[in-house]
């Protein structure tokens, strides 16, 4: 039975902002506890969203905010300090201060300030829940760095940072996310409706976990969906007119440069034939150790023409990323929330504040769309941007010149009637005859190669092609499909493990027969599924120190055999038997 819990916000006078009247805000919770926030104005709704989110997950909201003030390490130790350092390396606070009033519209700044006011009010009312005495009050500017940090992490900035300090640069990033998104046009559905799938995989709790809400104002903001706790609007979902989903993608968002240092002058590097001095950009974290970075003392970072620069045993390296080139992500999501049709949604995309993640869109007019989204710089085609770049020339220094949305990889209203993405290449985002032209895209944009697939992407394509038209029940069956495609086109090097000759390896004959006869369905009761999945993880882990699984087409048979031996040993050690069920 559905029920509603109505919450009135009675706050202490010192916590109340003058422009927000909490009496105008109503938070109604449904039977699942999801807040439905109603108020006359968008600003009041933002205030209510902050309050409702704090009621449910004030801890995670503070985890999002602490790095913006450099306080995460003081509360959560070494792991927390990593985020403090990344925020510093991004220059997130400085960029926000410089651009807050110029890059964000006045009406959206009111939304940010109202959300901050709601947070401050909750913190004032619940002081025992506050994690650090210097965290509150917050203002609108304090909300922006968490967006920049989140987008940087979604852009896998931790990979190049780790590569710089470990000396393992140039290795391809493995794609471990598990998100799925799809849209089906009315002419492809049995009911003549538009279908949208938003299945973005994030942690169940903690940083960057989904928080579901419904916001509704009398100014046209009416959105049901989800964000990360601390988001001032919703990041995906639906409104009465349209909806969209996100999946993580892997274009070239970050570049690494090796500087040519002067042989005699300290901290002096060559740039365009001149010798320039590195500018100190030191940072002091509050704990003793931070992974590969020593902390607890002043950290010696520098600024060069390329941005943040590091001294390592292998030389000086600079890192340049798109994640800190804009502060417009929160406003773009807000404008997407309020869009009433394709034209308004498309105009919101032109803000280009969301620097990564694919977008899959559908609306009630029948339009569907897939965008290989990203803030991608116009790079000099004479350089190999997949590796380490020379840090001595303006030819490799991309500035504020990015490809506009209409030059990104995309598909709009394809005749095949569907678009989809499962973290795989955007060049396979619809029916075979409607996919984007790979030759029209410069290689230095760094999009995944046309053959970079995931099993989920391969399965969706194989399943959707079976239907002339798709019912809603068909759509759900496709979404909940648990099978692996045969052959495994996403990881072709793994397919031979299913075709080993059991007579050649009697000690693992049982495992080989299981895999040979497996229907490729990852059912909870399947022993073959457990064997295959653990063997894959064993091989993937063994390759991490050297070659990426993305670079493989084949693997020596002995490696596959060793993986099955390892699986058998693991099961015997931990379960007392050579095979076990998946679930």
Model feature map: region roles:
Residues 20-207, 215-233, 322:
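Substrate-recognition/specificity elements adjacent to catalytic centers across diverse enzyme folds
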Residues 44-83, 88-93, 243-294, 400-453:
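Gly/Pro-rich active-site capping loops and adjacent beta-alpha segments
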Residues 217-218, 225-227, 237-242, 246-388:
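Glycine- and hydrophobic-rich flexible loops that cap the catalytic core of alpha/beta enzyme folds
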Residues 108-197, 202-204, 364-368, 376-378, ...:
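Acidic, low-complexity N-terminal propeptides/linkers enriched in Ser/Thr/Asp/Gly that mediate export
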Residues 331-357, 364, 437-496:
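Proteins synthesized as precursors that undergo proteolytic processing into mature forms
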Residues 1-19:
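Bacterial Sec-dependent N-terminal signal peptides
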Residues 354-467, 522, 535, 539-541:
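Hydrophobic alpha-helical segments
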């Amino acid at each position: 039975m559905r029920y509603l819990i109505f919450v009135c916000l009675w706050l202490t006078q010192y916590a109340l902002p003058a422009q927000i009247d909490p009496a105008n805000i109503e938070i109604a919770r449904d039977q699942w506890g999801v807040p439905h926030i109603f108020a006359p104005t968008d600003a009041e709704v933002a205030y209510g969203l902050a309050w409702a989110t704090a009621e449910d997950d004030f801890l995670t909201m503070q985890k999002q905010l602490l790095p913006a003030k450099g306080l995460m390490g003081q509360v959560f130790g070494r792991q927390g300090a990593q985020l403090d350092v990344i925020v510093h390396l991004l220059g997130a606070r400085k960029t926000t201060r410089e651009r807050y009033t110029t890059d964000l519209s006045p009406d959206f700044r009111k939304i940010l300030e109202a959300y901050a006011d709601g947070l401050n009010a909750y913190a004032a009312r619940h002081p025992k829940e506050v994690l650090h005495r210097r965290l509150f009050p917050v203002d609108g500017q304090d909300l922006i760095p968490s967006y920049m940090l989140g987008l940087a992490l979604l852009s896998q900035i931790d990979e190049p940072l780790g590569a710089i300090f470990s000396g393992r640069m140039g290795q391809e990033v493995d794609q471990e996310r598990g998100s799925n998104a799809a849209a089906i046009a009315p002419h492809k559905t049995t009911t003549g409706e538009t279908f949208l799938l938003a299945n973005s995989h994030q942690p169940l709790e903690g940083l960057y976990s989904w928080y579901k809400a419904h916001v509704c104002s009398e100014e046209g903001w009416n959105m049901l969906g989800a964000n990360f706790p601390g988001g001032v609007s919703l990041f995906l979902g639906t409104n009465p007119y349209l909806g969209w989903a996100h999946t993580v993608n892997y274009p070239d968002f970050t570049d690494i440069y090796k500087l040519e240092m002067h042989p005699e002058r300290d901290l002096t590097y060559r740039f365009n034939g001149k010798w320039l001095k590195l500018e100190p950009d030191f940072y002091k974290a509050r704990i003793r150790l931070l992974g590969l970075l020593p902390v607890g003392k002043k950290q010696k970072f520098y600024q060069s023409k390329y941005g943040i620069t590091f001294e390592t045993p292998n030389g000086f390296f600079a890192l340049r990323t798109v994640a800190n080139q804009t502060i417009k992500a929160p406003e773009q999501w807000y404008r997407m929330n309020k869009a009433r049709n394709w034209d308004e949604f498309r105009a919101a995309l032109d803000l280009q504040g969301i620097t990564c993640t694919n977008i899959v869109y559908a609306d009630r007019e029948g339009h569907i769309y897939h965008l290989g989204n990203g803030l991608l710089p116009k790079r000099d085609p004479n350089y190999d941007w997949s590796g380490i770049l020379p840090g001595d020339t303006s030819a490799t220094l991309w500035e504020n010149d990015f490809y506009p949305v209409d030059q990104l990889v995309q598909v709009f209203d394809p005749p095949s009637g569907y678009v989809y993405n499962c973290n795989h290449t955007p060049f396979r985002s619809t029916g075979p005859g409607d996919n984007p032209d790979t030759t029209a895209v410069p290689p230095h944009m760094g999009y995944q190669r046309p053959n970079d697939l995931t099993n989920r992407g391969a399965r969706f394509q194989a399943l959707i092609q079976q239907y002339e038209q798709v019912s809603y029940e068909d759509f759900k069956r496709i979404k909940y499909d648990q099978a692996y495609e045969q052959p495994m086109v996403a990881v072709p090097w793994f397919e031979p493990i299913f075709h080993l000759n059991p007579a050649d390896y009697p000690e693992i004959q049982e495992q080989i027969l299981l895999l040979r006869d497996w229907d490729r369905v990852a059912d909870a009761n399947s022993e073959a599924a457990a064997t295959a999945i653990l063997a894959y993880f064993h091989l993937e882990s063994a390759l991490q120190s050297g070659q990426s699984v993305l670079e493989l087409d084949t693997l020596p048979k002995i490696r596959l055999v060793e993986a099955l031996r390892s699986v058998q040993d693991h099961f015997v050690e931990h379960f007392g038997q050579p095979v076990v069920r998946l679930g």
